[in-house]
Amino acid sequence: MAIVGLGTDIVEIERITAHVARSGDKLAKRVLTDAEFDIYQQHSQPSRYLAKRFAAKEAAAKALGTGIGRGVSFQHIHIGNTPDGAPTIDFTEGAQQRLALLNGVVGHISIADEKSYAIATVILESR
């Protein structure tokens, strides 16, 4: 296997918290898939959850080489978790098409946060 994409993004959690305070769930509905939005609504720290998902999806879009736009939407990237809590990444629609163009078959993701920031790194591998 070879690495065909690498992306990293960092988000200031307070910036997301302020956006949610101003605009309610507007950003969450734009960024999160339906399954992610359900978790967001039940989460004990929804702004922190949203910041981590935002960073993860931006990192994934960078790894795909497109950023958000150019056929890749936030909705085309789903961040989940294994039963043990490790993050997972899945691609659909435009993101899946872009991954195929790179001959990519699997994405690896790491997400971390501390008091003020959320950061994510995505590595895409080919066959």
Curated annotation (Swiss-Prot):
Its EC number is 2.7.8.7. It catalyses: apo-[ACP] + CoA = holo-[ACP] + adenosine 3',5'-bisphosphate + H(+). GO terms for molecular function: holo-[acyl-carrier-protein] synthase activity; magnesium ion binding. GO terms for biological process: fatty acid biosynthetic process. Keywords: Cytoplasm, Fatty acid biosynthesis, Fatty acid metabolism, Lipid biosynthesis, Lipid metabolism, Magnesium, Metal-binding, Transferase. The keyword Magnesium applies. The keyword Lipid biosynthesis applies. InterPro entries: 4-PPantetheinyl_Trfase_dom, 4-PPantetheinyl_Trfase_dom_sf, ACPS, Ppantetheine-prot_Trfase_dom. This is Holo-[acyl-carrier-protein] synthase.
